[in-house]
Amino acid sequence: MNSLVATPPVPPHIYEYSRLSPSRPMSTPSHTPTTNRKRKAEDEHNDFDSRMSASPTNSPAFTPRTLPSSSRQIKRARPNMGGRPLSLPRLLETLDTDALRGVLRSICDRHPNLADEVVQTAPRPSVASALQVLRNYQSALQSSFPLGGNPESDYAYNRVRQPLGNLLEALSDFTPHFLPPNETQPSISLSYLDDVTEIIHQLPRWSSPQNNIERDSAYDEICKAWILVIREAAKRGGGIQLQYGGWDQKLAKHNQNSGGRLQAAVNDLASSLGWMHGPESQGFGSPGGNDLGSIREQLLSGTYGLGTPVKVGPW
């Protein structure tokens, strides 16, 4: 009978409470909250590390790049290997002075219209460069002499005839270049003539007079060059450059070494500087001539009257 007794209905709010608030055990371990907080801190730290290590996908500075594949060539591709001639700049680098000179001479011979352009483009030869070329010819002449025997004999002359002709030809070609009106500076012309005359002094002397004709002709040509330059230099400042350059003494020494072959140039120099040397030469040994020469030297040097006392008071 008791089993048939109906149980009283449970109020609805009991079901609602049981759904919203599930039952929990009454007794929980004391260490559970601490463990949960520790795990939560570790999870937050790991989450922060993962966010910092990850690259932002929306960053404007990030540009995705693809790594080069193994088939892509990193270095510049070279053309197909094969024989080919050198370019003009590389070819010119391999040529020495003699070879380059020969190439230019050959081109100018085949194309005469290029000769003037080469002359205008090339730098003007200096006295030093011209003398270096002449000394090279002189060295070739000296090395052509036979060993032993008489260096003034006809045999020696025949052995050195070709290099001797090359030197004399170079002298006749270079000298007009340093003469007026092509050379406008008398100092450059005089400097060239001074060195070239010394080279002529060193030309070999031969026992046969006919072999010395070329040497005598060289003296005649250089004497004419001296006269031309002296007259041109005398027009510049009354010839003061000739006086203070000591060219009268240098030319007199050259004339002595040549055996008087330059006497005409010495006379022309004395005539050009006659207003300086005339009274001294005419009154040589007389007190008057020496006094006039001394006064002229003081005037030219700017020392005239420095030792004279200045008069003070009424004249």
Swiss-Prot record:
Could you give a GO molecular-function term held by this entry?
A: proteasome binding
Q: Where in the cell is it found?
A: Cytoplasm; Nucleus
Pfam families assigned to the protein according to its UniProt record, in alphabetical order = Cut8
Residue stretches of biased makeup (Basic and acidic residues) = 40-50
Q: Which GO terms describe its cellular component?
A: cytoplasm; nucleus
Positions of region (Disordered): 1-88
Instruction: For this UniProt record, give its keywords in alphabetical order, as a comma-separated list.
Output: Cytoplasm, Nucleus, Protein transport, Transport
Which ranges are annotated Polar residues under compositional bias? 20-35, 52-72
What biological processes does GO assign it? nuclear protein quality control by the ubiquitin-proteasome system; proteasome localization; protein transport
Reply yes or no: does the keyword Signal apply. Answer: no
InterPro entries this protein is in? Cut8/Sts1_fam (IPR013868), Cut8/Sts1_sf (IPR038422)
Where is it predominantly found? cytoplasm
PANTHER family this protein is in?
Answer: FI02826P (PTHR28032:SF1)
Function as written in the Swiss-Prot or TrEMBL entry: Involved in ubiquitin-mediated protein degradation. Regulatory factor in the ubiquitin/proteasome pathway that controls the turnover of proteasome substrates. Targets proteasomes to the nucleus and facilitates the degradation of nuclear proteins.
Spell out the family assignment given in the record's similarity comment.
Answer: Belongs to the cut8/STS1 family.
Quaternary structure, from the entry: Binds the proteasome.
Q: This protein is called what?
A: Tethering factor for nuclear proteasome sts1
Its taxonomic placement starts with:
Eukaryota, Fungi, Dikarya, Ascomycota, Pezizomycotina
Gene, per the UniProt record: sts1
